[in-house]
């Protein structure tokens, strides 16, 4: 088991998933962000070095480079080895019945952007690569209501919203679209 040599990652987490933000800023200048899929099939762990904790969204807004400097304003690049606990600790991994699967990713370069969404809640976006330069793109959005929820105009159509793999999509007259109107049929 090691860093995945292939298989680009495109993953979205939402408030439907298990999200935990742990504040260690007072003792270690550290914030740990953990996201585990609702069905417990995969998990991501990010270590943010920060001297402050944002009481509204947890992690202060900004762009955090992924590296090994341990400096404030960065995210720890994963070496994959937790020597203290004698364990393998990837940044993103798959699980099945509590056991690791072969597909693991160790983020070694890139960045994590933290911002507030339109509802003022946490929006996190990872653009990284692992040691094999496999592209990794992960988004977490804490959700919140938007003006779109109550809009109803024009003729009635066979249209509904659906959540697929953590991504909000629109099914209209049998065709699947993303939120900007792109046809998702590939």
Predicted regions and their residues:
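Boundary/junction segments of secreted and surface-exposed precursor proteins
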Residues: 1-17, 162
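Edge beta-strand at a domain terminus
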Residues: 1-5, 110, 125-146
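Surface-exposed helix/loop patches within compact recognition domains
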Residues: 10-115
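A short, structured loop/turn motif at beta-sheet edges
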Residues: 114-122
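Residue-level detector of functionally pivotal "anchor" positions at catalytic/ligand-binding pockets or at interdomain
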Residues: 143-172, 183-184
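Short, glycine-anchored, charge-dense loop/turn motifs used at functional sites
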Residues: 176-182
